[in-house]
Regions:
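C-terminal motif of bacterial Sec signal peptides marking the signal peptidase cleavage site
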Residues: 27-30
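Acidic/polar, low-complexity intrinsically disordered N-terminal segments immediately downstream
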Residues: 2-7, 14, 32-166
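Alpha-helical transmembrane segments
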Residues: 21-25
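Ser/Thr/Gly/Pro-rich, low-complexity flexible regions
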Residues: 149-309
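Sec-dependent signal peptide recognition
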Residues: 14-20
Length: 309
């Protein structure tokens, strides 16, 4: 015969009951998982980013052939290759991908700027393929503004002779000039060739002094290593007859294709260390003096033009 015996609710029994209820609640709640979301776990490619959103490099040395852009990541354990897209013009080539070595937190993306023209401002962008990065935290695109510039180095002092603007009845009017060279290029600047206003007056008159005067004449040696060009024209500081009648020293072919053959008269003499210029002297809208008045540059270390001419 079964006899019911009432148990005493000691503190030990109460603790057991409470523990059982807690375990039941945990088991019940663990079954209700329909609203849980996947937890984000970083992997090596999701950390890749450009280090700058905008890159402005407008003084790239003209002789430089590549330009480096840095990418970074926070998880360097594994090697990874990241795809890159570019909107840069065809004169600049960018690789289609960049690789991080295992253990490295940075990678260098080198773009080829060897065909980038000097003086022109180039704009474009580079972007990381979205499948390789977490766009919520990474700099996915970097915008670039690039330009090349010559690095000018002084060669020292030379001499400048101008048969039209500086020579007078009593003097050759030869002027001391600083000569600069573009580093890595056969390109030169003759600095302040018409700074001597008194000599211009002696050659012409005070009434012929104008307001436009070239701070330098920039010229370059052509690929035939004989002829030189200066592209457009320079101002000699003189006017012919009142305002707006500047006397300009044109590259003949720039003034007119009719005079293109006269370009060949302008030559460098490396043996004598001189350059002969035959500009077409012209006043816009009026006419000119043709190419019969040459100019001569004696390089630093070249001859004294008083004796040479």
């Amino acid at each position: 015969m079964f006899v019911y015996t009432q148990k005493k609710f000691t503190m030990k029994n109460i603790f057991k009951i409470a523990s059982g209820i807690a375990i039941s609640l945990i088991l019940f709640s663990s079954c209700n998982v329909e609203n849980l979301k996947e937890t984000y776990t970083p992997v090596e490619v999701s950390e890749v980013s450009f280090t700058q959103a905008n890159i402005n490099a407008t003084s790239i040395p003209a002789s430089q052939t590549s330009f480096d852009i840095v990418l970074s990541r926070n998880t360097p354990e594994n090697a990874v290759t990241v795809n890159i897209t570019s909107t840069l013009p065809s004169s600049i080539t960018a690789p289609a991908s960049v690789s991080f070595a295992a253990g490295e937190t940075t990678a260098i993306l080198s773009i080829n700027v060897s065909k980038m023209p000097v003086g022109a401002q180039i704009k474009g962008s580079l972007s990381i393929d979205e499948s390789f990065a977490n766009k919520n935290v990474a700099i996915m695109t970097t915008s670039l503004t690039l330009a090349k510039a010559y690095t000018w180095v002084s060669l020292g002092m030379g001499q400048w002779f101008d048969n039209l603007a500086l020579m007078s009845a009593s003097s050759y009017g030869i002027q001391p000039v600083e000569v600069l060279k573009a580093e890595g290029f056969e390109r030169y600047r003759i600095m302040n060739p018409y700074a001597n206003t008194n000599q211009l007056i002696a050659s012409w008159s005070e009434a012929n002094i104008g307001t436009n005067r070239s701070a330098y004449i920039e010229f370059w040696v052509l690929p035939n290593d004989l002829n030189v060009s200066w592209g457009t024209f320079w101002y000699c500081g003189l006017i012919y007859d009142g305002a707006g009648t500047d006397i300009k020293a044109y590259l003949p072919s720039y003034l007119s294709a009719t005079y293109a053959a006269d370009d060949a008269k302008s030559q460098i003499d490396r043996t004598d260390k001189v350059v002969w210029f035959y500009p077409y002297w012209y006043i816009d809208g009026l006419g000119g003096f043709g190419t019969k008045y040459p100019c001569v540059l004696s390089f630093p270390g070249g001859p004294n033009l008083e004796d040479y001419l």
